[in-house]
Amino acid sequence: MSKYFNKHYWIRKLFVNNFFSKFVNQKLLNKIVFNSIYKSNHWNKSKKFDQSQSYSGPGSAANSIQTNNLINELEKFFKENRIKNILDAPCGDCAWIKRIFENNIEYTGIDIVKDLINKNKEIFKSNKNVNFYCKDLVEYNKFDNFDFILMRDFFIHLPLPL
């Protein structure tokens, strides 16, 4: 089906429009846009989800060279610096970082998309070191509780100009 008949396409277009965004609370705007991106599986061009892809976009694919290199470096850094608890914000669908969960690290993921957080809670419910919360990172203020804060894809989602 053409993207022009996709309701999520129009929701994003409407709310990202600079004119309209002046009249909408920024917190509500972020929620609407990112929920729409998740529900439409916007980042996954094939529109089919499998374990090698991610609802969070192509940069979050679990088996890419870029992702494997990053995970290897993070594991090394965590070990060398005795990192015991991390905050991942926004966490997305955790497709790329779940290997970290095997390293006895307390992991907290936050994301603005409630359905995504609920799905993560279901998928990782057997892992007692993993917690997820639906929070808007722009308003989150409990950073002192973590040894390391990962904000891999946060800055590219900020509206410009800041």
Predicted regions and their residues:
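A conserved beta-strand element that flanks and buttresses the S-adenosyl-L-methionine
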Residues: 150
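A short, conserved alpha-helix within the catalytic core of class I
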Residues: 157-162
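Conserved N-terminal segment of class I S-adenosyl-L-methionine
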Residues: 2-138
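Short conserved loop adjoining the S-adenosyl-L-methionine
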Residues: 139-144
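Hydrophobic adenine-recognition pocket in adenosine-nucleotide-binding enzymes
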Residues: 154
